Amino acid sequence: MTIQSLIVTIGSGGLVGFALGLLGGGGSILATPLLLYVVGVTNPHIAIGTSAVAVSVNAYANLIAHAWKGHVWWRSAVIFALVGTLGAFLGSSIGMLIDGQRLLLLFGLLMAMVGLLMLRGRATAPRAEHHQTVLRMCMKTSSVAILTGAASGFFGIGGGFLIVPALIFATRMPTINAIGSSLLAVGSFGLITTLNYARHDLVNWTIAMEFIVGGITGGGLGTLLATRLSASKHLLNRVFGLIVIAVAIYVIWRSWASLVA
């Protein structure tokens, strides 16, 4: 491991942490492409397993910062995370059976669709009370969580770009609270994915630790910026959508090129 590669890996982790802190997701979207195309990991499944470690730890670290600022709706977040981990385990088990480049191609297509939906925006939802988690909301949150967890595990990602809109859909919480609350699920889904991939020796622990070092620093900066932008939910949605689409285009191009080569 050279100094240059160490700097590149830590810097890449910083970008991942910044995205997690700012958007409550996007970290895992950025992590796998960065590991493959910048850091130099050659096996897509090892890149996915390794990114899951860093994304999980960074998500939990950023969760603390968001919780300190009062952004987390704990009951909805806990229900979503607990139920979603069941889906994440099943999804990750299936994902490991699929060719890595085909998995990345599907992942890129999914990102593009979600990014376009985020750019379109959504109708303003009636605000739910912070202290009310009625039975209907719990059931709605749980059903969305298990589907989101399955998708997150299948693609080997934390799934923040799915979890944020899913939380808004299920609970009608404001965007900044969905961002903060999503981090519990991002961390939990990443942890389950990590353990599942590690059982098959598909995690590079050295690179993962370097990612974490950069990610914690970047996450702090992202959280500060998220607080400043909390009053402009539409801006957050559009920034989120643009990042997802940009990364999607690159992932689709690279994975398609590998498949047809």
From Swiss-Prot:
| Pfam families reported in the protein's UniProt record | TauE
| Domain of life where this protein originates | Bacteria
Cellular location(s): Cell membrane
User: What is this protein's expression induced by?
Assistant: Repressed by BigR.
Record-annotated membrane-spanning stretches: 6-26, 45-64, 78-98, 99-119, 150-170, 175-195, 205-225, 239-259
Q: Which family does it belong to?
A: Belongs to the 4-toluene sulfonate uptake permease (TSUP) (TC 2.A.102) family.
**What is the name attached to this protein's record?**
Probable membrane transporter protein PD_1894
Q: What is the lineage of its organism?
A: Bacteria, Pseudomonadati, Pseudomonadota, Gammaproteobacteria, Lysobacterales
